[in-house]
Each structure stands twice: as structure tokens, then as C-alpha cells.
A protein has these predicted regions:
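Flexible, acidic/Gly-rich N-terminal and inter-domain linker regions that tether
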Residues: 25-80
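Proteins enriched for Cys/Gly/acidic motifs involved in redox and nucleic-acid/cofactor modification
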Residues: 52-55, 144, 158-186
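A broad detector of short, well-ordered amphipathic alpha-helices
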Residues: 40, 44-47, 71, 82-85, ...
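Acidic, Ala/Val/Gly-enriched low-complexity intrinsically disordered segments
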Residues: 14-19, 29-30, 400-402
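Zn2+-dependent cytidine deaminase-like catalytic core
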Residues: 63-162, 249, 269, 274, ...
């Protein structure tokens, strides 16, 4: 019965009853809408640091007093002050008696920074609204308990789905200690990623390629196979206007350690390069790669064990991997049940050719029941190309879907 309004001039939230009837009624309905409104603002500002906080989550915080936003903050980088601390410093004495909206439960442990829950409790904040509890076992409800024990009113679960989506990378990594894996492919309308001669630059247009570089900017690692390195000598860097992009860690699947010492990924110094080799790789080649500055991870005897590699990367706090490999690499990841999300770019071109490469090569799945299904599909037009993003519906590896149940 009472509509919630927000006055952008005064930065104040009021009910429609107050505006139109000359009196104020704060019903539970109005409070719920108010909580959602300010939580959306916290979620929005959390994305200011997208791609910069790994392996930490993105977190936004908003402090509200008398229906007005008096302070806000967001976590900028791992090892630096958390969102709540930035907001509290901005609020100063205005924090006393105010409400804090935060996208993730305040931390309760001493790490590279102190516990936020304790700082919030000592600030005089009267009420804390969190979008979701932190699945990190170091926290796991402890932050909210600190606040409750200090007499702070707490509420959890406001826009929880949006908060989980915001931190899908962190939630996968903190629960499984394996990175969130995103597979990207660009193809023609007839499903070709290159011509029969191997030409692939450029199938998609400038807008789609710009989108790919924005994706590189937000994920921690980028992965290709040795075939891509030998054929294209890519830099695997992020190229955005003004040079604002962050370069991901380069990861090369190279079972025999064949990466040339002259390859850009070893000589340009743009980012760390990890070579995933096998026990059968010549030790002299491995030592030369190490001497050239590469990190060499040995996983598997004849072929790179992708599941083992993901665990190794997770242990190195690489919380997300952007796979830009060819058809064989893509199929290997899909068959292993390691892919969480897919970005596909479809160009209005017809290439044809029985020998032209496709996005998913290998032996393929023999039965339709084994096919990888997608869900939560979104599409957009980028220039003349179609961009499709989706999540893998059925995780094919036991335990791989733990993060889907946060």
C-alpha cells in the first residue's frame, strides 16, 4: 500500500505516504523495499573493482542514516582495506546509529587486514544488512555473530541471488580451491573458427573483439594450447583504450615443453607465464623455459591432467581461468567437466569446408545424453555479431558443482 521513493536531490528515501499524505508510515513492506534499494547501490559500486580484487571477492558497502546515503566504499584490491572500512572512514561520526548495507558478510578473522565485523561493531552502526553470508570457512557466520553479540541488529539475504552472481568466481574458488573456468570461442554462422587454411583473423568484428578484451581484463588467467602459441605467437594481453586493462596470467598447455624461447609470452614481460608440461617433457627444455622466466607446472605423464592443473592454479590463488584455446582444448575441458561458463561470439559469415576447424573438436560425445547443456542464456548484438553467454547446466565431474549450491 505504501510506495517507496528516493529523492536524488536530497539523497533521501521516503515512503509515498510521506510525500503524498503528509505523514510517515514505515511499514515492513517499505523497509524491505528500502533495503533492496540500498543493497542495489552496494552491489553497483562493488563492481568498481571488477577484475582487481582476486582472489578476494568484490564487496560494496553503503551507510545510510535517516534515509540518506552518508558514505560508501568498495574493496579495491586484495590486501587493502575492505569495503566496510572505506565506508566507515567516509562516514565518521555519522556512522553512529546508522544502517550499513554490505554485499557480503563482514569478515571476522585477522588476515592481511583486521576483522571488519569488529570495526563495524565499534563504530556505533545500529543495523547491518548483508546480501549473503560468506562461504569462507574462516568467516562462515562468525562476522554476523560478532555484530549480534555487540547488540547490532542484523539481516541477511537481501538480493542474495544478485550477490552470488556478483561473486561467482570467488564462491567457486573459496569452496573448491579450483578456479572458475570460462570458455570463449568465436565462430562463423556455420560453426567454423578458422578457414581450411587456418586463417582466423578476424572472424568477428571490432565490437566483439573489444568485449573479449574486457573479459580478459576481469579474469585472473588466460589459457591456450601450444598449437595456438606455435601458429600465432600471441601476446595474450588485454588491449583496452587508454591502456587501462589488466593483463591476466598466461597459461600454456604444452605437454612436451615446446614453447619457443622467442615466444612473446616469454619475452614481452607483460605478465607472468605458466607452462603446463608433463613428466615426459625433456628436462632440458623445462629448465630452459624456467631460465627464460616461465613457471613450469608438471601435471600428468603423457597429457596434461587438466583437473590437476586447475588444483595447482587454485593453490596459486588464480581464481579464474579464461580459456581461449582451439577445438581440441575446448573439448578436453568440456569432457573433463571443468567449464563453468561459456562466451560464444557468432559472426554473420559462412566459411564452409570439411577441413575447417570448429569450436569443439576431439572425438566428441557419442550419445546425446552426454552432450553439455547450457542454461541461463543471455544474448546481445555487438556490431554485426551475436554474443551468447551461458552457464554449463550439468557439471560432468563429481564435486565440480559445489559452488552452484551456495
Amino acid at each position: 500500500p505504501y510506495r517507496f521513493l528516493y529523492c536524488w536531490f536530497s539523497h533521501t528515501c521516503v515512503s509515498a505516504a510521506e510525500v503524498f499524505g503528509g505523514f510517515f508510515i514505515l511499514s515492513s513492506e517499505v523497509r524491505c523495499v528500502e533495503d533492496e534499494f540500498f543493497m542495489r547501490e552496494a552491489l553497483r559500486i562493488a563492481r568498481n573493482a571488477e577484475g582487481r580484487t582476486a582472489p578476494n571477492p568484490m564487496v560494496g558497502a553503503v551507510i545510510v542514516k535517516d534515509g540518506r546515503i552518508v558514505a560508501e566504499g568498495w574493496h579495491r584490491k586484495a590486501g587493502t582495506a575492505h569495503a566496510e572500512i572505506h565506508a566507515l572512514k567516509m562516514a565518521g561520526e555519522l556512522a553512529r546509529g546508522a544502517t550499513l548495507y554490505v554485499t557480503l558478510e563482514p569478515c571476522a578473522h585477522y588476515g592481511r587486514t583486521g576483522p571488519c565485523a569488529k570495526a563495524v561493531a565499534e563504530s556505533g552502526i545500529q543495523r547491518v544488512v548483508a546480501a549473503m553470508r560468506d562461504p569462507n570457512p574462516l568467516v562462515a557466520g562468525k562476522g554476523m555473530k560478532i555484530l549480534e553479540d555487540a547488540g547490532v541488529e542484523v539481516k541477511v539475504g537481501v538480493l542474495a541471488d544478485e550477490a552470488q552472481k556478483l561473486n561467482e568466481v570467488f564462491l567457486k574458488w573459496v569452496v573448491t580451491k579450483c578456479p572458475f573456468v570460462v570458455l570463449k570461442t568465436a565462430m562463423s554462422l556455420d560453426g567454423k573458427i578458422a578457414t581450411r587454411s587456418g586463417a582466423s583473423q578476424w572472424i568477428t568484428g571490432e565490437a566483439a573483439r573489444h568485449c573479449v578484451h574486457k573479459l580478459r581484463d576481469i579474469y585472473a588467467g588466460i589459457l591456450v594450447g601450444i598449437g595456438t602459441v606455435l601458429a600465432d605467437d600471441p601476446s595474450l594481453t588485454t588491449r583496452l583504450p587508454g591502456g587501462s586493462g589488466k593483463n591476466p596470467v598466461r597459461i600454456i598447455l604444452d605437454s612436451k615443453a615446446r614453447t619457443p624461447l622467442t615466444a612473446k609470452v616469454l619475452t614481452d614481460g607483460a605478465a607472468e607465464t605458466i607452462i603446463a608440461a608433463t613428466q615426459n617433457a625433456p628436462k632440458t627444455r623445462i629448465e630452459r623455459l624456467k631460465a627464460a622466466g616461465a613457471v613450469v607446472l608438471v601435471c600428468g605423464r603423457e597429457k596434461v591432467d587438466l583437473a590437476a592443473l586447475m588444483k595447482m592454479l587454485g593453490e596459486r590463488e588464480i581464481s579464474s581461468v579464461f580459456v581461449e584455446g582451439g577445438g581440441r582444448v575446448n573439448f578436453s575441458f568440456l569432457r573433463a567437466g571443468l567449464v563453468d561458463k561459456i562466451h560464444a561470439f557468432l559472426a554473420p559469415k559462412l566459411i564452409g569446408g570439411r577441413d575447417a576447424l570448429t569450436p569443439v573438436e576431439g572425438e566428441g560425445f557419442a550419445d546425446l545424453a552426454d552432450a553439455v547443456e547450457l542454461e541461463h542464456i543471455k544474448t546481445e548484438i555487438l556490431g554485426s555479431d551475436l554474443h551468447l553467454s551461458a552457464y554449463v547446466k550439468t557439471c560432468r565431474k563429481e564435486g565440480a558443482d559445489v559452488h552452484r549450491n551456495y
